[in-house]
């Protein structure tokens, strides 16, 4: 029996200085990553969520730190998921590592 990679009870890595709108954008992106790893998501929706995420987190160093924290908590890899999503030409996307 294959065990799930993620922990269902984890907190998203967030910055306490973000506004409510920014927290919603980042949380929506994390949920899109989860959808891509657990099932399927419209590729356009995932890419749009990433664009919104980047308006909140424009610095590459902060993005990498949040991605590390998110992977440690959830087991999902943002960089690999997004790289695969950006390379696909399919309307629906499902990440497989």
UniProtKB/Swiss-Prot annotation:
Pfam families: UPF0223 (PF05256). Gene3D superfamilies: BH2638-like (1.10.220.80). It comes from the Bacteria. SUPFAM superfamilies: BH2638-like. InterPro entries: BH2638-like_sf, UPF0223. Belongs to the UPF0223 family. This is UPF0223 protein lp_2149. The lineage of its organism: Bacteria, Bacillati, Bacillota, Bacilli, Lactobacillales.
């Amino acid at each position: 029996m294959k065990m799930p990679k993620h922990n269902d009870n984890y907190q998203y890595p967030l910055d306490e200085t973000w506004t409510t709108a920014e927290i919603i954008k980042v949380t929506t992106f994390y949920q899109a990553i989860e959808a891509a790893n657990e099932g399927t998501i419209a590729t356009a929706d995932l890419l749009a969520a990433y664009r919104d995420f980047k308006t909140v987190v424009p610095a590459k160093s902060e993005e990498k730190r949040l991605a590390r924290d998110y992977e440690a908590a959830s087991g999902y890899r943002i960089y690999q998921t997004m790289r695969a999503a950006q390379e696909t030409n399919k309307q629906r996307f499902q990440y497989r590592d």
